[in-house]
Amino acid sequence: MLLNQNTNDNYTARQLKLPLEIEKLIDISDPVYTFCEVMDHIDLSRYCSLREIEKLCRNDIRYMYLLDEMKAPTFATFGNLIRNELTDSIEQIFMDINAYIFSKDHVDLQHTYIDGTKIEANANRYTWVWKKSCIKNRQKIFDKISLLIDAMNQEVLGYLGLKLEKREEYAINYISELLEMYKRGTGLDENLFVSGCGHRKSIQQKQYQELQGYLKRLKTYARHIEICGDERNSYSKTDQDATFMRLKRDYMGNDQLLPAYNLQTAICDEYIAVIDVKPYASDMECFVPLVEKFNRSYGHYPKYPVADAGYGSYNNYLYCEEHGMEKYMKFTMYKKETTDKKYRENPYRAVNFTKDADGNLICPNGQKFLFKRTQPVKYNKYGRTEELYECESCEGCPHKQECCPRAHKNRTIRMNQELTAIHQEVLNNLTSIHGALLRMNRSIQSEGTFGVLKWDKSYKRLFRRGEKNVILELTLISCGFNLYKYHNKKQRQMKQCHLAVSYTHLTLPTIRL
């Protein structure tokens, strides 16, 4: 029985391209293959514009390979995908990518390098609203309302047997009630109000409209203060979640504050493990939320959280003690303590004072410092207190100019023995061999991460507005950063293996038979 044999070659007479598979045109070491190994669609390049991505899908063969030769999506399709599908799921996608990479690369999650940077928001530059200015102007409105109520009672309501009550501060609802009482007491009809040239307003209409204007301004100030909240003192009108901060790169040249977000990252073995976005200009208040997010993501706290002096506070140190973390965050005067010998050994510093048998501090002149009282420290979570000590007598002291030249009375010092002991523990940790290696790695990994993002990828300004969209954008950036880092590590390992094999072949002895 004869079998039908297929003798057709893999081509058509109208074929217009060779080869048939686009992937044969792409270098085997191209990052696009790593993309497909981890997930189906991802972008590791520095393209953030959706229109630019659409253009690449039409012209770049690497993007065509990802699309499997399907029709290139429009920029609106990309935008809808990000806005509707990724906004709520991007955190889980980021964790899934990290879980894959960390298991393949055996990432150490016990050593975490923490740092923050300020990224300029996508907001107009001169759209600031200052909370303190709103509070000050609101108080001025309160004073004007009191004067207006006096005029109302004296000029109009006094003849009608009515009187409006004055207060130190006026709520919006109370001003609305005053307007209604004044309108009802005087029989005003807003439909009969006059305006424009040739019309003279009555005194009742003038007072009523003036109070209406104050009410409108109070509502505006109340809204501004509510948007600022308790955690910040400013916001931008075009991006209400952005806070005005002082950036290192002052391209405007006038030392002006710019709307920005504080990006916090936790780096493990050069990968971004956790990111967080906060409206605080200082890093000190960002440590606990970032570490808590790390715990929620990986189920444990890092054993060695390493950070710069911006994170070293009493609250953060005690937080580390509570959760079994070692103290490897520098404190404010760490650099001066370790590099300035004159400052470190200054005999007039309270920490260098000697103590007598009773535990009293003794100054270089031999005078005792007696305990006066204990006072609490403001804005402290753990109830931190300070001990206040005063010298017995500074009169006729030969060390007056070196010890306290500006003091007119006996010198007083404030100390916290617990905080002093914590600083000494931090010094011992960071000056050890292990601590020196951690400090070096923090500078390389955390600072290097921001260097790659800001300078190598030219990512210095956000593209989206609103905290939720900013977190989405930065998480997408972190996904691309980790995948690109993983790809580069794989390529280096493959190259090292290839060189090792080549070297082995070159050095094998020749065996003669």
List where the protein language model places each region.
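DNA-recognition alpha helix
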Residues: 52-65
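Phosphate/diphosphate-binding loops
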Residues: 318-319, 327-367
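Generic long, charged, amphipathic alpha-helical segments
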Residues: 418-430
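Short amphipathic alpha-helical "interface-anchor" segments enriched in bulky aromatics
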Residues: 32-39, 57, 354-368, 373, ...
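Basic, low-complexity segments
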Residues: 2-44
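Conserved small/polar residues in nucleotide/adenosyl-binding loops
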Residues: 503-510
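Polybasic low-complexity intrinsically disordered regions
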Residues: 58, 73, 78-322, 332, ...
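Cysteine-cluster motifs in flexible loop/terminal segments that predominantly coordinate metals
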Residues: 360-414
